């Protein structure tokens, strides 16, 4: 059983949904990044979604773009990323670790080599932000060979054929977008995506996590009410890092408290 399967089975047994925070690796510095991610775990995160810093993160809004910039400006290297991932894996042997990455970063290392290095660092899944489902199969095939789960994005306007394709190829979980556009906590999540979720379930897809615009406990409750298995929050988490760049202790305390409040909203009645 994979870490994701164990995680979702445990949540189901406890009648809970998943809360998954997102941060950029190396933000604000490689050293502080470790403290940040440990705070997310200590706050009760069910899984982690971690971004590899990239100079042109087209799927992300201003908040996460600035996080990418901070990580790169602080000198975060690929070596640092592997070290951070290994330290987090040692800190929490069971938590599922997902990566959000842009294709250029994979090509730069060589596709097979990239996945192998991530597997060795303790990563469970990889989502490629800028590769459409149709073109992602070759990445997914290599990932599967190596033992990494390939996560796919299901957009809100996905056709039935695309949803079936996603259900077939996707592993770990499906990242379901609550709306189109770029990430951001200011843009509220749109109407519940229950129709899409039902279609994915019927097609045999892995669990669905709803993302984009998830910044308050009631957003988590709405995601679960729509039938999602959990919710991902990125910009709202990164905002707490940005707010306390000069105060590491406050940063950690705020992150822990935020995750705790979001996790509390995952309890199903």
UniProtKB/Swiss-Prot annotation:
- Under what name is this protein listed? Tryptophan synthase alpha chain
The record's section on InterPro entries has: Aldolase_TIM, RibuloseP-bd_barrel, Trp_synthase_alpha_AS, Trp_synthase_suA
Q: What is stated as this protein's family in its record? A: Belongs to the TrpA family.
Q: Which GO terms describe its cellular component?
A: cytosol
Report the domain of life of the source organism.
Bacteria
Protein's UniProt keywords contain Disulfide bond? no
Which species is listed as the source?
A: Idiomarina loihiensis (strain ATCC BAA-735 / DSM 15497 / L2-TR)
- Please give the catalytic activity noted in the UniProt record: (1S,2R)-1-C-(indol-3-yl)glycerol 3-phosphate + L-serine = D-glyceraldehyde 3-phosphate + L-tryptophan + H2O
Entry annotated with the keyword NADP: no
Pathway given for this chain reads: Amino-acid biosynthesis; L-tryptophan biosynthesis; L-tryptophan from chorismate: step 5/5
Q: Which SUPFAM superfamilies match?
A: Ribulose-phoshate binding barrel
Assembly with partners or alone: Tetramer of two alpha and two beta chains.
Q: Which Gene3D superfamilies match?
A: Aldolase class I (3.20.20.70)
Q: What does this protein do?
A: The alpha subunit is responsible for the aldol cleavage of indoleglycerol phosphate to indole and glyceraldehyde 3-phosphate.
Q: Mind listing the GO molecular function terms for this protein?
A: tryptophan synthase activity
Quick one: which gene encodes this?
A: trpA
């Amino acid at each position: 059983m994979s870490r994701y399967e164990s995680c979702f089975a445990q949540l189901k047994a406890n009648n809970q949904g998943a809360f998954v925070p997102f941060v950029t690796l190396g933000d604000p510095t490689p050293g502080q990044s470790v403290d940040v991610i440990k705070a997310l775990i200590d706050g009760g995160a069910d899984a982690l979604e971690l971004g590899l810093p990239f100079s042109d993160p087209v799927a992300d809004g201003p908040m996460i773009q600035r996080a990418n910039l901070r990580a790169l400006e602080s000198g975060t290297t690929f070596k640092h990323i592997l070290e951070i991932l290994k330290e987090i894996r040692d800190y929490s042997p069971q938590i599922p670790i997902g990566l959000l990455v842009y294709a250029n970063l994979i090509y730069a290392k060589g596709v097979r080599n990239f996945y192998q290095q991530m597997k060795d660092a303790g990563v469970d899944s990889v989502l490629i932000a800028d590769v459409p489902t149709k073109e992602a199969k070759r990445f997914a095939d290599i990932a599967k060979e190596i033992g990494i789960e390939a996560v796919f994005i299901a957009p809100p306007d996905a056709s039935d054929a695309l949803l079936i394709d996603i259900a077939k190829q996707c592993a770990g979980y499906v990242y379901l977008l609550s709306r189109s556009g770029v990430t951001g906590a200011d843009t509220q999540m749109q109407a519940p995506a229950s129709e899409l979720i039902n279609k994915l379930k019927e097609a045999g897809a892995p669990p669905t996590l709803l993302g984009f615009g998830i910044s308050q406990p009631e957003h988590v409750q709405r995601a679960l009410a729509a039938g999602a298995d959990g919710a991902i929050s990125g910009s709202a988490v990164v905002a707490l890092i940005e707010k306390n760049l000069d105060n590491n202790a406050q940063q950690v305390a705020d992150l822990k408290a935020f995750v705790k409040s979001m996790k509390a909203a995952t309890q199903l009645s």
